[in-house]
Amino acid sequence: MSVKDFVQQRRDTLIAMRRDFHMYPEPAWLEYRSAAKVADTLISLGYDVALGADVLDLDSRMGLPSDEVMKAAMDRAIEEGANPELVEKMGYGKTAIVATMKFGGEGPIVAFRVDMDSNDVIEAKEDNHVPAKGGFRSCHDKAMHACGHDAHMTMGLGLAEYLAVHKDEFKGTIKLIFQPAEEGVRGAKAMAEAGVVDDVDLMFGMHIGFNENLSNCFACSDHGFLATTKLDAVFHGYSAHAGGSPEKAQNAMLAGCTAVLNLQAIARHSQGASRMNVGVFESGTGRNVTPDVAVLKLETRGATTEINDYMIERAKTIIKGAAEMHDCTFEITKQGETPAGRISDDLAREVQAIVEPLGIFKEVPFDYSGGGSEDCAYFLNRVIDRGGRATYMVVGSAIKAPHHNPLFDIDEEDMLNGIVALGTIAAHYLK
């Protein structure tokens, strides 16, 4: 059976699966229900499934929620039908899965990476929003699959089922990596450092959506990844009465203001794109109280890892200087980070030659440069560094609103076409 026929046969099941994932979104490191459902499915298909601490370098995890938050998410996942044994194995920030199937005969080790986490977004309730109208809007407060990771999990499991059903036709090994905490670029490093791709010959990452210009297209590479670092900076001062004794205060808010203005003024780099954004600034408790704490949440980006490093060092210098100017102390904590990703152009050209003849996409461009950041770069770079090849593909979709927007939604036909493409690519290299 061709991949196209298989997907058509499983169409209703795959759409229902995507809608189930969509209805139960879980943010970074809290993907207990999602990961348990994924693992249960992979086990039932006959995959050798490793998960939790077995596929994570625990010290390399970034931006973990508190134990209290994680425990509440674990309990909720079990209440919502997750396998309790699997939740326990992946508990407290260990929601990572690697599924492997070895086929008969010698062949390459081919890996696909899938991300699972949701966004901190309140999903729209309007009738023109298909998930709301169709009854599969998020049932979790302040969590939404607003970046297509619900579709990614479905595509990964659709690929897994196709390969398992047709396993006698293949040679080599398939490795399916289901990664937590892509949002905020917090999860891939821990899996890469655990060595999960060290034996991989061909590495594929992918994403659905992006913009209307890419609708019903399949891009075979993405050369636009920016390196990025996510930082929290906290200034500590000393509060005093704003009218009675202002001279005794150490104003943390002023330190924060000084930092924000000068962070945004960092000279941009001549060798490529550089970015700085302070997305959150929190300070103050009352109009007549000098603020003693200020919190900044910021990010840097760079076209190369070196440019991003330049932005980080300038940011740290400015934060330190702002603290000293206002007689405050400070602390900086890293919440997420990824290098710039590398692509094997020859592999991307091969993918183009494999997908184009399918005739299901209006265009199959060689490259799409989105200008965002993706911690799949850890996997891509590690495979290339060890002599393998890697690329990152984009399944274009007629999205209803921008990524991370309350009205975001993908076209499920594009998701199904994406499974056809992934299955065809995998089959090509495993035959």
Where on the chain are the PLM-derived regions?
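Acidic/His- and Gly-rich active-site-bordering loop/insert found
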Residues: 2-145, 158, 169-170
